[in-house]
Amino acid sequence: MAPNAAPALAGVLETALYVDDMERARAFYEGVLGLEPMFGDARLTAYPVGGRGALLIFRRGAANHTAHLPGGTIPPHDGSGPIHCAFSIAADALPTWEAHLAALGVAVEGRTEWRSSSGAARSVSIYFRDPDGHLLEFATPGLWPRLDFDQHGAKT
């Protein structure tokens, strides 16, 4: 490693979204996306996603003060306005997800077909919103080719 070079990061462990109504958010993330909470209370619900990370749903304003825990402290954080979060899905699952969202009245606001510099099809993304206006994305493999892994975490 070069002098003053940063050590390697192992991945993104958590992504946080901030919501106004925790019950409404849980109904969406559990009922529409099928996520199962690993922890939940009035302040925070945490969902495992893909076996490699967690989606944290905080009630807006609930984390804007220092949290004092037995093992230390967590600095304040919060977010306002629509935030973007993308989920990876299998290419053959895209039509099923589109039908599932439509059946539940969740509007797909956009669709992008990603292409390589040569024009070859690479990936497809669809975009929709949660009840708090956060922009969510389902992306098929190939959007970020260096990041494609199978369901077991093996590089494809």
Predicted segments, located by residue:
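Short beta->alpha transition motifs characteristic of CBS
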Residues: 121, 138-145
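Helix-adjacent hinge/juxtasegments
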Residues: 60, 65-90
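N-terminal beta-strand motif that seeds the catalytic metal site of vicinal oxygen chelate
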Residues: 1-23, 84-85, 89, 142-156
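Vicinal oxygen chelate
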Residues: 20-23, 80, 84-132
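Short glycine-/small-residue motifs
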Residues: 54, 135-138
